[in-house]
Amino acid sequence: MSANVTLLLIFVTLASVTAQTFQYSRGWTNGKRDQGHLRPELKELINNMDKILSPCQKNKLKYLLEGKPVTERLLIPCDILDTEEYPRALTERNLNAMMDAFY
C-alpha cells in the first residue's frame, strides 16, 4: 500500500515539474508568446492596428472575436453606421426582409 502511495506522489511531482517547465519555456510567459519570430512588416501591422481600423471596425472585430452571433448590424458597412441617420432603405423591417430573401 505504501509503495503505491509513494509511486503516486512521485508521479504527481514529476507531472507538476514537467508542466511548469513547459509553461516557462520558449518565451511563453503569462499567456503571451514571444513575437521575435514575426517578420518586421507583420510587427508593424500589429502595432499600427489602431491607425488601420476605424472604431466601428474595431467594435465589430471585438464582437466577432468574443464569439457572439452574427447579426444584421454586423453586415451593414461602417460608413453607413457612422452616419447619424440611417438611409430610409436600411430600416430594420427592410433589413429583415432582405435577409429572409437570402436564407
Swiss-Prot record:
InterPro entries: Procorazonin. The modification Asparagine amide is found at N30. It is found in: Secreted. It holds the Pfam family Corazonin. The modification Pyrrolidone carboxylic acid is found at Q20. Residues 34-103 form a propeptide. Expressed in corpora cardiaca (CC), corpora allata (CA), antennal lobe (AL) and gnathal ganglion (GNG) (at protein level). Expression in CC and CA detected in all animals, expression in AL and in GNG in some animals. The keyword Mitochondrion does not apply. Its main location: secreted. Keywords: Amidation, Cleavage on pair of basic residues, Neuropeptide, Pyrrolidone carboxylic acid, Secreted, Signal. Cardioactive peptide. Corazonin is probably involved in the physiological regulation of the heart beat. Residues 1-19 form the signal peptide. Belongs to the corazonin family. This is Pro-corazonin. The keyword Signal applies. GO terms for cellular component: extracellular region. GO terms for molecular function: corazonin receptor binding. GO terms for biological process: neuropeptide signaling pathway; positive regulation of heart contraction. It comes from Agrotis ipsilon.
